[in-house]
Amino acid sequence: MVQLSRRGLLQKTGISAIAATGFAGCLGRGGGSLDSVTVAYVPIFPNMQHYVMEQEGYYEDVPRDVTVERFSSGPSVVKAFASGDVDVALFGITPAMVLADRGKEAGILAANSKNGFKIMGTTELAERYDQDGPATFERFEQEKGRKIRFGAPPDGSVPDIVLRYWIQEDLGVGEMASTINKSKVPPARAVQTIQSGDLDATIIQEPFATIIGQDERFGELAWSGDILSNHPVTVLFASQQVLDDSELAQSLVEQHTAATQFTAESPDTAAAHAASVIGSGVSEELATTAMDSQASDYISDPHAITDQATTMSEFVANVGNIEQPVGTENLFAFDPYDAIQE
């Protein structure tokens, strides 16, 4: 059974934070198996499986009551997950690394998406990069008297890590801080910010990359799948209590895998589901167009992202969001996925 968001329910009934704590306790957060499970998600395109699972009724087949809760950002999910308010989350892999680094007993059950960004810039910059490649950065600064202005989410976020890898490892043009002028711009604001002329470039996910690409003033410099091939974007992350309940964990992965298959076979319908849940200016037409992008790449197999997760973890540690790189054994829970493959 899929229920209303607990947060929305509490707001509607005016229950205090103290009562909320008691209510959470009633949902089986003590020892033993869970009677219900709270699934948190961030409303972004890379979490496509969630929209399919919710709209197609796949959560109904999970053998526990499912409560779905929407969060505005990865950090807000990290806080809720760390405090035990949610059991399962669909969010970026770097927030999962932060939780693992903090000692939270949990693991990645499935991958959601990979290769999910495009580096978009002004037509002038895109043409210059096409011609000059890595030398673009130095020549731009020589001619303009300033560094390229890049918009990206906060340090240590998935797109930030991919951007760092591109500049420092793929292109080898130096440390990011000395190569570009980075502004912290959330994905939802990137389109407006670059169109207003405040940015020269941005690293952006779908469907925002499609919006920018439809404007003749802008072009594509690079696709993240060519920068760090098969890098993860978002994941399905579960608490230890979920992992200990093999029936529940396997069911979540089974429904997730079914949603990935549904997305591959019926991309237009999946796009419509995403648009209906995300809202915020994401129309069905835009979502459908964005599904044709290289940056719309959905998977479930957690084994497919382990190598690049290790690489990304090193960068997250260098940024300072985690104390040291998180090992695969401390980040992934492969058994439920492997069990349903047998």
Functional labels for PLM-detected ranges:
Residues 32-44, 64-70, 147-151, 181-183:
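Short, well-ordered beta-strand elements
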Residues 43-71, 75-76, 97-102, 161-170, ...:
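Short, polar/charged alpha-helical segment
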Residues 45, 68-79, 91-94, 175-196, ...:
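Short helix-initiation/N-cap motifs at beta->coil->alpha
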Residues 186-276:
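Pocket-lining segment of extracytoplasmic ligand-binding domains
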Residues 1-22:
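N-terminal secretory signal peptides and thylakoid transit peptides that target proteins
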Residues 313-342:
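Conserved C-terminal helix/tail region of periplasmic/extracytoplasmic solute-binding proteins
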Residues 244-322:
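Secondary-structure end/capping motifs
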Residues 112-183, 240:
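A conserved helix-loop-strand patch within extracytoplasmic ligand-binding domains
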